[in-house]
């Protein structure tokens, strides 16, 4: 009987059930004295028959056990610790000692009394010895007994219905064993070790003090080495240093039992056997150097009973919970134990008696690394492994995704999904600033500007002499050459427009001084110029240059700088709404045009008409032949097709250009002043200029959308008679208020212009802005269509005009000649335009209204207009002689002939100026002649309206080579800009080309701004009268410049020839043109 600290322990299930099977004629017993710690000694030896039966049972047990070892682990469950534990804990005899891993349970030594039958039986059975035979057990086969199981608190299985009674004398067995194994350590110490490794069931009382065993973690691993068990029989080496004479079955039994238990932590609390020195001391004498011990295997800690899962078909299909597993304790994994393979090095079952001391050494077996999942946790480990794999996969997936990334593979799934949206720059500052230092040198000049200035021939000395002029012309060049990639850098600096991008060709750009307008010069120009460039690219159907240029090798360059220059706007309308877009300057060049620099090819402004040479060059460059349509219904949308050459090429081109709305041109016609005296019949009872101004205001007042929306078409007044004086005063007051509001708007617009250069950061804001601009553009187009329907006549032009023959092609339509059905002898010119392809529909309305209200002998007569299925048909007088450019190119004009052209032109300008209209694009391309030499002006698309209030304009439009210095310098200007252009046209008629045509466009603008009056190549060849007249027209100070009335009274004009003198020149030009066609 053994007792320690008033706590009784007894051998728990199933060992007391196995002991009767070992009592086969054994006379030897072990006796243990609880208080004295007597050693157990061997008494009898088993006879051979009994020993054989014993080993047979053990072998069968181990053979059956092998069926489970590879698939299952073992857990320790807590055994209920009641007084009748020996009766409650029943075990199947098949799960005998031979199946060491299948002998779990808690050994309750409180029940082992020296006078107890079970104690005696245990000691007798355990000390049975076979004498000469070793205690090693050979594996046998155990038939059907493998189906029996223990109670749920022990190894899972079904308990025996009628367990055999136990009458072992455990006390005598243990005493005998302790005496025989004194050198090896007492059995009591081993049992004490075993008792300290076991814990109570979750549902039963705790056998340890202070509930210490409840804190012991569990491990779900069990190691089984069948080779070790099998090779133990007959192999004395396995016994290590044990004394053969003292070998008893208890040694192996206890060793096997220890192998089936999971090593408990030494911190399990105070030892139950604290007062039994011999028992405790004996445990330390376990031979840890036993060669058979597999040192790589060390038991782990568990506070549960060893529970075995039932057999399953596949290891992968094992459930997460053990069969009949106790619910009290959740296993805690301390280390990963693996099953030993069949070829692994043999190990002793006593290897785990070291009470947590790691005596392990790496195994050298071939399959020693073969692993097996732990019982009850294998599916969890698989799940963890799979989760880990999925986690790693997710990490790499997120790493290359746009919005997610992972900072650690081991981080949780929530941590790797990080939003990778890259924020836009914040607190950004635009520090680029161009200035001039004390030495006159530029500071902060962008590289693009330096390269541009250097390539354009403007030396640093010239830049230092006129820094402001350089800045002005660079800004102007930016406006007129917006789609040049080299000049995109300009948009990054202070010259930026707030005009909307509802259309790249929106017509009314801001005209604030010092702020250049771009092709997108509309009041809605709040988008970035980069977006404008993209829009321009999208508008490929509207080539920027379709106008004819002088016939020179550098026709591409000339095509970009085709002369077409409307007059600037007055200051009052200089708000962003009234700013017009610059026309591309390409002067008609005579034979000397071949000297155009290549750099000018890539830098050009849009022209509005083609010269005969430019037509030929365009035809050669495009290599496209446009067949004249047989039916007028065909829409001319191919802007790249070759321009058909009519009888009067320049005239037909001018006709085509009148309808063509260049991206660089903006409608700048201001409302007709209250004193303007247009006939009501010509305006069709509609103040067309008010329509244009209303459209401009709608475009410019972006900041006041309500005001823009509140301007209905009903505001158009019918003016059958001039307004009364009271009405005039009212209109003046309204104009004053309007001017004030426009100036206020300009001040407001100046502020956002600085920040408009910054890109839109918020994508949603950009989308809303784009949507708003699309809506504005749509609304604007609807308004224009509505106004055109009011202006145009009803009917089908195909029924009114017959024999249509195409003579030219423009950017958005073709030019035809036809005969009036009612007057077969009358030949008319018809411009057919597709409104959808028109970049700036406002120019069309402007031109129609100006021509309707301008009935003059020196202005091309407007006949009628029709709007048919989206096509606008403009019918006007046909000038078969072509443009003045063709005469200048092919002929040398006398001073009398030059005077005749100037006189007729001044008559037309006087008429327009009297109506408050500035043409702003006077050049040889826009002067048409008939076969009799009569001269008429055309192309009123860039006309601007001025009145008493707004006498000046600041918008830079027109062709640069014919442009006045005040326009280049962005100063206020008035009708006298047309007089300057007339003086440049005189030089063109004298020398065959305008000044600076051979210079790059940027340098030409610089020279116009800095040189003032251009100098003639051979001034001594001219008379004093023409030089005086020319000097009067080309005064840099527009206040000293003569007006149309004054110039008409000049001696040079009074002594000029009649227009009939021009008829031969027209015929010569026609002949040379025909010759060119034949060639």
Curated annotation (Swiss-Prot):
The lineage of its organism: Eukaryota, Fungi, Dikarya, Ascomycota, Saccharomycotina. It holds the Pfam family Pkinase. Its main location: cytoplasm. The keyword Aminoacyl-tRNA synthetase does not apply. GO terms for cellular component: cytoplasm; incipient cellular bud site; mating projection tip; nucleus. Residues 309-322, 523-548, 591-600, 679-690 have a biased composition (Low complexity). SUPFAM superfamilies: Protein kinase-like (PK-like). Belongs to the protein kinase superfamily. STE Ser/Thr protein kinase family. STE20 subfamily. It is found in: Cytoplasm; Nucleus. It comes from the Eukaryota. This is Serine/threonine-protein kinase STE20. Keywords: ATP-binding, Cytoplasm, Kinase, Nucleotide-binding, Nucleus, Pheromone response, Serine/threonine-protein kinase, Transferase. One of its GO terms (biological process) is stress granule assembly. MAP4K component of the MAPK pathway required for the mating pheromone response and the regulation of cell polarity and cell cycle. Phosphorylates histone H2B to form H2BS10ph. Residues 21-32, 211-220, 706-721, 730-753 have a biased composition (Basic and acidic residues). Residues 21-50, 79-116, 148-220, 261-323, 339-389, 501-766 are annotated as: Disordered. Its EC number is 2.7.11.1. Gene3D superfamilies: CRIB domain (3.90.810.10), Phosphorylase Kinase, domain 1 (3.30.200.20), Transferase(Phosphotransferase) domain 1 (1.10.510.10). Disulfide bonds: none annotated. Residues 80-91 have a biased composition (Acidic residues). Residues 422-435 form the CRIB domain. PROSITE patterns: CRIB, PROTEIN_KINASE_ATP, PROTEIN_KINASE_DOM, PROTEIN_KINASE_ST. It catalyses: L-seryl-[protein] + ATP = O-phospho-L-seryl-[protein] + ADP + H(+); L-threonyl-[protein] + ATP = O-phospho-L-threonyl-[protein] + ADP + H(+). It comes from Debaryomyces hansenii (strain ATCC 36239 / CBS 767 / BCRC 21394 / JCM 1990 / NBRC 0083 / IGC 2968).
């Amino acid at each position: 009987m053994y007792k320690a600290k008033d706590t009784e322990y007894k051998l728990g299930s199933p060992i007391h059930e196995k002991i009767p099977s070992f009592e086969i004629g054994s006379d030897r017993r072990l006796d243990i004295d609880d208080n004295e710690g007597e050693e157990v000694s061997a008494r009898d030896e088993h006879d051979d028959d009994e020993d054989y039966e014993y080993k047979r049972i053990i072998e069968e047990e181990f053979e059956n056990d092998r069926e489970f070892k590879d698939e299952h682990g073992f857990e320790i469950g807590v055994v209920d610790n009641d007084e009748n534990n020996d009766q409650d804990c029943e075990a199947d005899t098949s799960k005998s000692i031979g199946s060491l891993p299948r002998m779990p349970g808690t050994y309750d030594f409180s029940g082992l009394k020296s006078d107890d039958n079970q104690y005696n039986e245990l000691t007798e059975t355990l000390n049975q010895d076979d004498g000469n035979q070793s205690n090693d057990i050979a594996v046998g086969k155990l038939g059907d007994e493998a189906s029996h199981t223990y109670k749920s608190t022990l190894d899972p299985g079904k308990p025996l219905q009628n367990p055999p009674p136990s009458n072992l004398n455990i006390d005598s067995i243990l005493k005998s064993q302790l005496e025989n194994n004194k050198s090896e350590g007492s059995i009591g110490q081993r049992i004490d070790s075993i008792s300290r490794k076991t814990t109570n069931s979750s549902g039963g009382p705790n056998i340890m003090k202070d509930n210490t065993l409840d804190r012991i973690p569990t491990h779900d691993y069990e190691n089984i080495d069948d080779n070790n068990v099998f090779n133990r029989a007959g192999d004395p080496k396995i016994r290590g240093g044990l004394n053969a004479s003292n070998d008893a079955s208890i040694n192996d039994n206890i060793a096997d039992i220890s192998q089936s238990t999971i090593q408990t932590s030494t911190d399990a609390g105070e030892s139950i056997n604290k007062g039994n020195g011999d028992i405790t001391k004996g445990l330390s004498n376990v031979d840890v150097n036993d060669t058979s011990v597999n040192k790589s295997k060390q038991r782990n800690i568990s506070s549960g009973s060893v529970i075995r899962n039932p057999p399953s078909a596949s290891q992968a299909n094992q459930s997460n919970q053990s069969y009949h597993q106790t619910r009290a304790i959740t296993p805690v994994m301390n280390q990963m134990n693996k099953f030993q393979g069949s070829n692994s090095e043999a190990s002793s079952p006593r290897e785990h008696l070291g009470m947590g001391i790691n005596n392990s050494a790496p195994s050298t077996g071939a399959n020693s690394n073969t692993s097996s999942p732990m019982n009850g946790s294998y599916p969890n480990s698989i799940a963890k492994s799979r989760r880990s794999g999925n986690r790693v996969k997710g990490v790499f997936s997120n790493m290359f995704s746009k919005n997610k990334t992972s900072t650690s593979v081991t981080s949780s799934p929530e941590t790797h999904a990080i939003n990778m949206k890259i924020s836009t720059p914040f607190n950004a500052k635009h520090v680029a600033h161009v200035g001039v230092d004390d030495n006159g040198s530029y500071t902060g000049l962008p590289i693009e500007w330096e390269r541009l200035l250097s390539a354009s021939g403007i030396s640093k000395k010239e830049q230092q002499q006129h820094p402001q002029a350089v800045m002005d012309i660079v800004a102007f060049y930016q406006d007129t050459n917006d789609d040049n990639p080299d000049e995109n850098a300009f948009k990054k600096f202070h010259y930026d427009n707030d005009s909307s991008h509802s259309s790249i060709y929106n017509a009314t750009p801001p005209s604030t001084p010092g702020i250049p307008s771009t092709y997108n010069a509309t009041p809605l120009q709040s988008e970035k110029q980069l977006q404008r460039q993209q829009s321009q690219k999208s508008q490929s159907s509207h080539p920027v240059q379709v106008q004819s240029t002088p016939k020179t090798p550098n026709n591409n360059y000339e095509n970009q700088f085709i002369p077409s220059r409307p007059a600037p706007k007055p200051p009052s309308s200089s708000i962003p709404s009234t700013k017009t877009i610059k026309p591309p300057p390409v002067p008609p060049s005579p034979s000397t045009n071949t000297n155009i620099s290549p750099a000018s090819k890539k830098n050009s402004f849009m022209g509005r008409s083609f010269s005969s040479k430019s037509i030929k060059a365009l035809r050669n460059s495009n290599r496209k032949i446009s067949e004249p349509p047989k039916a007028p219904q065909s829409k001319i949308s191919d802007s790249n097709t070759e321009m058909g050459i009519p009888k009067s090429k320049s005239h037909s081109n001018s006709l085509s250009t009148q309808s063509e709305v260049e991206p660089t041109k903006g409608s700048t016609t201001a409302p007709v002043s209250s004193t303007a005296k247009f006939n009501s019949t010509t305006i069709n009872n509609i103040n067309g200029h008010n329509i244009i101004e209303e459209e401009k205001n709608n475009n410019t007042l972006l900041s006041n959308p309500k005001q823009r929306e509140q301007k209905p078409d009903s505001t158009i007044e019918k003016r059958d008679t001039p307004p009364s004086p009271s009405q005039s005063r009212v209109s003046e007051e309204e104009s004053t208020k309007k001017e004030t509001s426009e100036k206020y708007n300009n001040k407001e617009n100046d502020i956002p212009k600085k920040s408009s250069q910054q890109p839109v950061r918020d994508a949603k804001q950009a989308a809303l802005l784009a949507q708003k601009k699309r809506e504005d553009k749509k609304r604007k187009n609807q308004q224009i269509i509505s106004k055109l329907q009011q202006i145009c006549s009803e009917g089908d032009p195909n029924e009114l005009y017959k024999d249509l023959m195409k003579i030219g092609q423009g950017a958005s339509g073709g030019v035809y000649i036809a005969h009036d059905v009612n007057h077969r002898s009358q030949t008319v010119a018809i411009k057919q335009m597709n409104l959808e392809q028109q970049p700036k529909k406002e120019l069309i309305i402007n031109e129609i209204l100006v021509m309707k209200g301008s009935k003059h002998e020196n202005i091309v007569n407007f006949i009628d207009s029709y709007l048919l299925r989206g096509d606008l048909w403009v019918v006007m007088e046909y000038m078969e002689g072509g443009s003045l450019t063709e005469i200048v190119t092919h002929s040398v004009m006398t001073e009398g002939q030059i005077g005749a052209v100037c006189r007729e032109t001044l008559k037309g300008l006087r008429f327009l100026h009297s109506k408050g209209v500035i043409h702003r694009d006077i050049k040889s391309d826009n002067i048409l002649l008939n076969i009799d030499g009569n001269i008429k002006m055309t192309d009123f698309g860039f006309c601007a309206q001025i009145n008493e209030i707004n006498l000046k304009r600041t918008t830079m439009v027109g062709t640069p080579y014919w442009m006045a210095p005040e326009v280049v310098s962005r100063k206020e200007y008035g009708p006298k800009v047309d007089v300057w252009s007339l003086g440049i046209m005189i030089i063109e008629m004298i020398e065959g080309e305008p000044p600076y045509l051979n210079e790059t466009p940027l340098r030409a603008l610089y020279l116009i701004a800095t040189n003032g009056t251009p100098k003639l190549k051979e001034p001594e060849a001219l008379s004093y009268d023409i030089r005086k007249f020319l000097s009067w027209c080309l005064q840099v100070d527009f206040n000293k410049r003569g007006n149309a009335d004054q110039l008409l009274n000049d001696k040079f004009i009074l002594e000029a020839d009649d227009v009939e003198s021009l008829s031969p020149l027209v015929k010569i030009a026609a002949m040379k043109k025909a010759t060119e066609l034949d060639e």
